[in-house]
UniProtKB/Swiss-Prot annotation:
One of its GO terms (cellular component) is nucleus. The modification N-acetylmethionine is found at residue 1. One of its GO terms (biological process) is intracellular protein transport. This is Syntaxin-112. It comes from Arabidopsis thaliana (Mouse-ear cress). Belongs to the syntaxin family. Keywords: Acetylation, Coiled coil, Protein transport, Transport. Vesicle trafficking protein that functions in the secretory pathway. Part of the t-SNARE complex. Residues 52-119 form a coiled coil. CDD domains: SNARE_syntaxin1-like, SynN. PROSITE patterns: SYNTAXIN (PS00914), T_SNARE (PS50192).
């Protein structure tokens, strides 16, 4: 079943085949239950619409992934460019990507929430634990896992952009002063709340450096604000993903409990059989003892005559 979660982005036919294969393997985990793994025409119709929804979500997540990759490449370009005009263009493209990612991420969140509600409502026609229900639940979990991985990629990229800018300021400060900046100086430069006197004096000597640094600082601040807004969107989505993670843990716990119940039932049956054998043994010995006593009595009566 876990394999299905990592393979949930296959084509319609492949998804259907993988769902059947993975659920057949689940019989090893849930022995004693007899599931029908052949999809009926009604199952096919139900899953057909479901897989179309999955494909829509899949496409959106792939687009977000590509935008994140483009965002990473644009960030690399900002570190090497010396033109303020090019830097402004890169900033605008990065902000455009961030806005698009935010919009698509919100759409994915809404679609997954809707899909979850439909999965629950679908149990009125296809009971919980049925082949269709297990397929829908497992593939939905796979979508959530993919979304969580994409969110992790964004968080890593966000931290890398901030770290790169911090190192850039630190390097400029050292070139201007010959000293390493203190944490307080770094925070002032990053926040824009103040500046370091030695660095300012250096820029006064080279005003073109002042212009470039100011332009870069404004560009990075704009990008930071956009990244923080997107970060908040992903934080809201994290609640959705982590809640499902708790549910998955509950499912695993239920499977473990089911295994313990099966094991306990097997042990109880074993002890019951042992007790049954012991009871039969006691009945046999009592019967033999009764026969012996009867024989002794008969022999005694015959001897007394």
């Amino acid at each position: 079943m876990n394999d299905l979660m990592t393979k949930s982005f296959l084509s319609y036919v492949e998804l259907k085949k993988q769902a059947r294969t993975d659920m057949e393997s689940d019989r090893d985990l849930e022995k004693g239950e007899d599931f029908n793994f052949d999809f009926s025409p009604a199952d096919e119709e139900n899953l057909s619409g479901f897989f179309q929804e999955i494909e829509t979500i899949k496409t959106l997540i792939e687009e977000i992934t590509h935008l994140l990759l483009d965002l990473q490449n644009l960030n690399e370009e900002t570190k090497s460019t010396h033109s303020t005009k090019i830097l402004r263009g890169l900033r605008d493209r990065m902000e455009s990507n961030i806005v698009t990612i935010s919009r698509k991420a919100n759409t994915v969140k809404t679609l997954i929430e809707t899909l979850e509600k439909r999965n629950v409502a679908n149990r009125t026609s296809f009971k919980e634990g049925s082949c269709v229900d297990r397929t829908r639940t497992s593939i939905t979990n796979g979508v959530r896992k993919k979304l969580r991985d994409t969110m992790s990629e964004f968080h890593r990229l966000r931290e890398r952009i901030f770290a790169d800018y911090r190192e850039d300021l630190k390097r400029k400060y050292f070139l201007a002063t010959g000293e390493e900046p203190s944490n307080e100086d770094m925070e002032k430069m990053i926040s824009g709340s103040g500046s370091c006197s030695d660095l300012v004096k250096t820029f006064e000597v080279k005003p073109e450096m002042d212009l470039k640094t100011k332009e870069r600082h404004e560009a990075v601040n704009d990008i930071k604000r956009s990244l923080n807004r997107l970060h908040q969107v992903f934080l809201d989505m994290a609640v959705l993903v982590e809640t499902q993670g708790d549910r998955i843990d509950d499912i695993e716990a239920n499977v473990a409990n089911a295994g313990s119940f099966v094991s306990g039932g097997t042990n109880s049956l074993y002890y019951a059989n042992q007790m049954k054998k012991k009871t039969k043994s006691w009945v046999l010995w009592v019967s033999i003892l009764g026969v012996l006593i009867l024989l002794v009595c008969v022999i005694s009566m015959l001897a007394s005559r």
